[in-house]
């Protein structure tokens, strides 16, 4: 049995794992996912932290998780990030993701990646530092959040091809910063993140 699975099963409760993607980028939304694994299936053995997986493997696991687990996705766009700051926007996205799972089924506890409990969430929860490499449910949520956000940035790149969103996914790479200095921001950029660059 995988250690990630053991970690979850030790709780002896119905768990929802929560993680986010996109707290650091200069553009695009922050995306949160909440995942409840109803029944263990063999392919879950391949899951670990989404950052350690290839893009192709993440995509394959994403499809399986969506098909076989209870999944909720929450989004806070760049406008909301600018209005309430990235941490609060992340919590908003997480609450939206959990609400979508809650609309489908009941659960006992939320395990959230990181060292912050979700603000204004009144259910039972626990913050798990490096949770995406400890908990199977959080690792699954990590994959769903990352793939969902990456796909959104690819779509944004069709509207604004000159920014190369499909390559850097909105992160502050050298290329992205150079394009920003040359062209200025588009509507998907987080204005509150650009003060040190522009």
Residue ranges and their predicted role:
Residues 1-198:
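RNase H-like, Mg2+-dependent phosphodiesterase core
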């Amino acid at each position: 049995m995988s250690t990630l699975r053991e970690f979850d099963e030790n709780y002896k409760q119905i768990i929802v794992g929560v993680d986010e993607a996109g707290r650091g980028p200069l553009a695009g939304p922050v995306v949160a996912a909440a995942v409840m694994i109803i029944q263990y299936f063999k392919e879950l053995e391949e899951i670990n932290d989404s950052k350690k997986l290839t893009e192709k493997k993440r995509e394959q696991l994403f499809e399986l998780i969506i098909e076989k687990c209870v999944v909720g996705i929450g989004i806070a766009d760049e406008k909301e990030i600018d209005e309430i700051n990235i941490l609060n926007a992340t919590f908003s996205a997480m609450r939206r993701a959990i609400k979508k799972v809650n609309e489908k089924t009941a659960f006992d506890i939320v395990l959230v990646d990181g060292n912050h409990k979700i603000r204004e969430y009144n259910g039972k929860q626990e913050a798990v530092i490096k949770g995406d490499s400890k908990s199977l449910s959080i690792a699954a949520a990590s994959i769903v959040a990352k793939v969902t956000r990456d796909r959104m940035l690819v779509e944004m790149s069709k509207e604004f091809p000159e920014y190369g969103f499909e390559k850097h996914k909105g992160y502050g790479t050298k290329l992205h910063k150079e394009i920003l200095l040359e062209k200025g921001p588009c509507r998907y950029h987080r204005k509150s993140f650009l003060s040190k660059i522009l």
